[in-house]
Each structure stands twice: as C-alpha cells, then as structure tokens.
C-alpha cells in the first residue's frame, strides 16, 4: 500500500476557494487503485495544508500522476492557488491499524 502526501502553502486567504475547487475537481472521478483521499488544513497555519491519498500499488499511483485527468484537469485547476511552496512525498505504508 502506498501513501501520497502533498504539503503546500496557498496564497494568503485563498483556502476556502481552494477547498471548493479541490472538491469540484476531485469528486466523482473513478481512479484505478485509489483507496481513499483526504484534504487537511493546518490548524496552526490556515494557508497551509495536506492532500493525502492511499493507493493499492506504486504503479497505480504513478499511473494517476501521469494520467490526462491529473495533468490536464486537476493540476491546472489547483496549481494556481499555491504560493510556490509545494512538496509531494510518496511513502510505502508499513503499519496500519
């Protein structure tokens, strides 16, 4: 199982608009291998947050990252909200409860 964690800093004061765009862009898309996805706002920095997704395999996650949906719909819609600080981590899940 693979976890994809993206941390980003949004342009000041744009969280609500970003959250609406995220929900509108992500909802209803059937993505092979995707087990679940979460969007979390930092409680100490309202302009910072995390997108976390859980995948069956590394290959499924990589296929998503290379897909037309990701490159042509999701990224172009969400990227303009970021203030330049944006990092994605890809993790092999070692423990689950």
Task: Set out the residue ranges of the language-model regions.
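Short S/T/G/P-rich N-terminal loop/turn motif that feeds into the first structured element of a domain
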Residues: 1-50, 54-69, 76, 80-97
């Amino acid at each position: 199982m693979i976890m994809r964690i993206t941390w980003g800093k949004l342009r000041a004061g744009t969280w609500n608009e970003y959250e609406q765009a995220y929900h509108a862009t992500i909802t209803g898309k059937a993505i092979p291998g995707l087990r679940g996805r979460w969007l979390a706002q930092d409680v100490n920095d309202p302009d910072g947050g995390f997108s976390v997704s859980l995948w069956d395999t590394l290959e499924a996650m990589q296929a998503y990252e290379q897909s037309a949906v990701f490159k042509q719909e999701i990224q172009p819609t969400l990227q303009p909200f970021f203030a330049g600080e944006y990092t994605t981590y890809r993790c092999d899940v070692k423990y689950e409860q």
